[in-house]
Amino acid sequence: MNTLFMHCRPGFEGEVCSEIAEHAARLNVSGYAKAKTGSACAEFVCTEEDGAQRLMHGQRFAELIFPRQWARGVFIDLPETDRISVILAHLREFPVCGSLWLEMVDTNDGKELSNFCKKFEVHLRKALLNAGKLVDDPSKPRLLLTFKSGREVFMGLAESNNSAMWPMGIPRLKFPRDAPSRSTLKLEEAWHHFIPRDQWDERLHGDMTGVDLGAAPGGWTWQLVNRGMLVTAIDNGPMAESLMDTGLVQHLMADGFTFVPKQPVDWMVCDIVEKPARNAALLETWIGEGHCREAVVNLKLPMKQRYAEVKRLLERIEEGFKARGIRVEIGCKQLYHDREEVTCHLRRLETAKKTKAR
């Protein structure tokens, strides 16, 4: 079980390889990363039998940027018939698992396996339960089967509290019919990823205020309004009338990079298409100057050296706050709804503590 298998957005396999190789080196896990461009997956093959397990135990999945999902395990070939017997035979070396997910990679070929996986899961789950290899226990590892085809599957394990919260790392979010653009799902997914669900009522509630920089037509503003917040939308373009009719939105025709709120707000969100260094500087300024407590900002990626650029910007942000003497939580992820970009979340810790006395 010396291979770490990872899902990702097609075209970002190289970034996954660079990122996981760096963490493996930090944890003294020897091996090599490999991937095929456009395959929507990557592997890190460890030279030691326990390498993949040590790598997963030493690294929090939520802190990885480009991998959508991961599991440690092995590839096995399957026959056309009686696949279950072959899987059960290989599972003799596996521990009893607490849950089962069948996955496929995010490519056209992978999507064609969706119906097969749905039907096959019913029979496989029954067989695993009867064999005593599957129980309902989240404290036990999750069994992840990623089908590359009907004849090849990666059998892997991952801890449910240190892996993706959705199969393949793809959220099942419904587009709100009254939202003005599909970009609204990007911010909703960011909240799921960066904020524990049991903290939403505390950190995303109707007594809060927010600013949306580059807001038009209002996809991200809609999410803030949907939580009951009073929102200042900054954009020279028009906002959706449905949002303005809520009475919760003030639209200011202004430049998102020069606007400063008269009073500090709880949230700043920004999805402006601009050079990533400029958006990163905006993020540092708003949190550092105390204009907001939490922020979600998208960083558009260059064509080359994308992981290196993201890492450089995150290090610059972190060093900037250290120089200011400000403690912050910094998160960064290429979300499913992101394209050539990553989403950053920052939370100023001192400010968050002070607000509890309100």
Swiss-Prot record:
Keywords from the UniProt entry: Cytoplasm, Methyltransferase, rRNA processing, S-adenosyl-L-methionine, Transferase
Q: Which residues bind S-adenosyl-L-methionine?
A: 183, 216-219, 235, 255, 271
One short Pfam name that applies is RlmM_FDX
Q: What is its EC number?
A: 2.1.1.186
Q: Where does the UniProt annotation locate this protein?
A: Cytoplasm
Which reaction is catalysed here? cytidine(2498) in 23S rRNA + S-adenosyl-L-methionine = 2'-O-methylcytidine(2498) in 23S rRNA + S-adenosyl-L-homocysteine + H(+)
State the Gene Ontology BP annotations.
Answer: methylation; rRNA processing
- Give a GO cellular-component term: cytoplasm
Active site (record annotation): 300 (proton acceptor)
Could you tell me which InterPro entries the record lists for this protein? RlmM_FDX, RlmM_THUMP-like, RNA_MeTrfase_FtsJ_dom, rRNA_MeTrfase_M, SAM-dependent_MTases_sf
The principal localisation class reads cytoplasm
Would the keyword Transferase be found if you checked this record's keyword annotation? yes
MF (Gene Ontology): S-adenosylmethionine-dependent methyltransferase activity
Family the UniProt entry places it in: Belongs to the class I-like SAM-binding methyltransferase superfamily. RNA methyltransferase RlmE family. RlmM subfamily.
* NCBIfam families in the record: PRK11760.1
PANTHER family, A to Z:
RIBOSOMAL RNA LARGE SUBUNIT METHYLTRANSFERASE M (PTHR37524), RIBOSOMAL RNA METHYLTRANSFERASE FTSJ DOMAIN-CONTAINING PROTEIN (PTHR37524:SF2)
Query: What does this gene product do?
Result: Catalyzes the 2'-O-methylation at nucleotide C2498 in 23S rRNA.
Note the subunit structure.
Monomer.
Q: What is this protein called?
A: Ribosomal RNA large subunit methyltransferase M
